[in-house]
Curated annotation (Swiss-Prot):
PANTHER family according to UniProt: L-ORNITHINE N(5)-MONOOXYGENASE (PTHR42802:SF1), MONOOXYGENASE (PTHR42802)
EC numbers, comma separated: 1.14.13.252
Positions with a binding annotation for FAD: 23, 43, 45, 50-51, 62, 127, 386, 397, 399
Domain of life of the organism encoding this protein: Bacteria
InterPro entries hit by this protein: FAD/NAD-bd_sf, Lys/Orn_oxygenase
Catalyzed reaction equations: putrescine + NADPH + O2 = N-hydroxyputrescine + NADP(+) + H2O
Keywords associated with the record: FAD, Flavoprotein, Monooxygenase, NADP, Oxidoreductase
Matching Gene3D superfamilies: FAD/NAD(P)-binding domain
Descriptive protein name: Putrescine N-hydroxylase
Record's function text: N-hydroxylating monooxygenase involved in the biosynthesis of the siderophore putrebactin. Catalyzes the N-hydroxylation of the aliphatic diamine putrescine into N-hydroxyputrescine (NHP).
Species whose genome carries this gene: Shewanella oneidensis (strain ATCC 700550 / JCM 31522 / CIP 106686 / LMG 19005 / NCIMB 14063 / MR-1)
A single BP term in Gene Ontology: biosynthetic process
Binding residue positions for NADP(+): 62, 104, 207, 231, 275, 309
Cofactor(s) of this protein: FAD
């Protein structure tokens, strides 16, 4: 058998992104008009498809449409959602609808629309290894073309890791049993689920709530028993008040990043309702639907809090879910035909990084030591997306802060800010020692400035000046990102409440 000849792209890219989710897709869109930056983004998938297993018809984003791929960095970009709506003849419908929150299906369509216009994306390419040539200061990214099987090599000076998160499964869950599934595959398994006599949803985050609501709508048609169980003491709503939303601002990121790792860990634990709760409107919709269903049918439905899943017995015709009640301290069993685990997602450093792992910095707890500018290595060459819950706080998975992070990364890569970066947008001050400075710096549009890196970093072109951009007024804080509890790197798994 002949081994395919390795194909080497001799271009030395200034920036190469691995993984094309919303955050790296947004970065690719922001890179497109920058003439002095050559970049390429790779993904093993054959096309962009955002959480296909959770594209439930009734689901919507928890962030406004302005948290698209580009608007918060460049409102004039042709890759904005508003331009997508115009180009697809739905702008007036969107205007009449008067709802800032997009259906998740539409957000996926928008991202696919952007991906098809960008020439710096390469889908169907699976990265297998990354090595560093210290003499030339170049990274060699080895990959496989999934269509042809041909080995590929790409060369670059800077890397951005955007490989995303994977479903988190508790140790006591036998996922090899087809009756046990994660919420990430819900839509693919929905037909199977609705053929069962009893379905149990575990978790109290947004994903679990959306699945329960979706299954509840047809409960009287299919006649199944539907259970919703969680270890949380109640079904917490997502905190959505405006002053709290300022905790997704650059101001709070500055404050949070300067805290000790112990204090940051404590705060993230305390702030779960700020990024793991359920949309309050959805909670109300669930209650109203329960009320309506019981008016017309004697449905079998159970909601139970304060119960921790301890084991799943798969030996019988039905699954036996074993729980412990956390307040009354007793054991209970629940028989079910199938179980959906809405237990969130966690980040794993990808295997292909082993060749350069010695360059990556970790803290005393073994977590990624992510710098303020999202760099993770000693030279400032490698950056990471959506893995900084433990270093940058609840803004890390926030779609609305994706543009801010990407603008910050581009500034670190280029040595200048191609897009204005807001540094002071919050009305509140998070650290008393900064009050005097806050008084001297008004909330005006002159608050754009460079993010100060935690280390000395050399950009590709530090002598260049910023690309001309229209003056932008300070942004308002945006909402927390949806679904699944996106997570930090190499820390305790960021799980949705179980």
């Amino acid at each position: 058998m002949t081994t395919p000849k390795k194909e080497i792209d001799r271009t030395i890219y200034d920036l190469l992104g691995i993984g094309i989710g919303p955050f790296n897709l947004g970065l690719a869109a922001l890179c497109e008009p920058i003439n002095d930056l050559s970049c390429l983004f790779l993904d093993a998938k054959t096309e962009f498809d955002w959480h296909p297993g959770m594209l439930i018809n009734s689901s919507r984003l928890q962030t406004p449409f302005m948290s698209d791929l580009v608007t918060m960095a460049d409102p004039t970009s042709r890759f904005s959602y508003l331009n997508f709506a115009k180009q697809t003849s739905r702008l007036y419908s969107f205007y009449i609808r008067e709802n800032f929150f997009l259906p998740r299906h539409e957000y996926n369509q928008y991202c696919q629309w952007v991906s098809k216009q960008l020439s710096n994306l390469n889908f169907g390419v699976k990265v297998t290894q990354v090595n560093y040539n210290a003499g030339e200061g170049i990274y060699a990214v080895t990959a496989i073309d999934r269509r042809s099987g041909k080995p590929l090599t790409y060369l670059c000076r800077k890397l951005v890791l955007g490989t995303g998160t994977t479903p988190y499964l508790p140790d006591n869950c036998p996922i090899q049993d087809p009756r046990v599934m994660h919420s990430a595959s819900y839509m693919q398994q929905k037909t199977y689920l609705q053929s069962q006599s009893a379905i149990t949803v575990i978790g109290s985050g947004q994903s679990a709530a959306e699945i329960f609501y979706d299954l509840l709508q047809d409960i009287d048609i299919y006649g199944y028993q539907l259970n919703w169980m969680t270890r949380s003491p109640r079904f917490y709503p997502l905190e959505y008040t405006k002053l709290t939303l300022e905790m997704t601002s650059p101001d709070y990121v500055d404050y949070f990043h300067e805290l000790s790792s112990e204090k940051r860990h404590r705060l993230i634990t305390e702030q779960k309702s700020l990024y793991k709760g359920i949309n309050a409107e959805l909670i109300n919709d669930i209650y109203d639907l329960l009320y309506q269903k019981r008016l017309i049918s004697n449905i079998q439905c159970q909601l139970l809090t304060n119960v921790a899943l301890t084991a799943i017995d798969t030996s019988g015709d039905k699954l036996k879910l074993q729980f412990k009640h956390l307040e009354q301290d007793y054991a209970l069993d629940q028989l079910t035909s199938a179980v959906v685990l809405g237990t969130g997602y966690q980040y794993h450093l990808p295997d292909f990084i082993q060749g350069i792992k010695s360059q990556i910095e970790f803290d005393d707890h073994g977590q990624l030591a992510i710098q303020r500018d999202y760099g993770i290595d000693v030279r400032g060459d490698i950056f990471i997306q959506n893995a900084g819950l433990h270093t940058h706080g609840i803004s890390s998975p926030d779609l609305g802060m994706g543009c801010y992070r990407n603008a910050t990364i581009l500034q670190a890569v280029l040595g200048y800010a191609p897009y204005p970066i807001e540094t002071r947008i919050a009305f509140q001050t998070f650290a008393p020692c900064n009050i005097a400075d806050a008084k001297r710096q008004p909330l005006e549009s002159n608050t754009h400035s460079a993010v100060t890196p935690s280390k000395t970093r050399q950009g590709l072109n530090p002598s260049a000046k910023s690309v001309q951009q229209p003056s932008i007024e300070p942004q308002t804080a945006l909402r927390i990102a949806p679904t699944g509890g996106n997570v930090s790197a190499l820390m305790a798994p960021n799980k949705e409440a179980q």
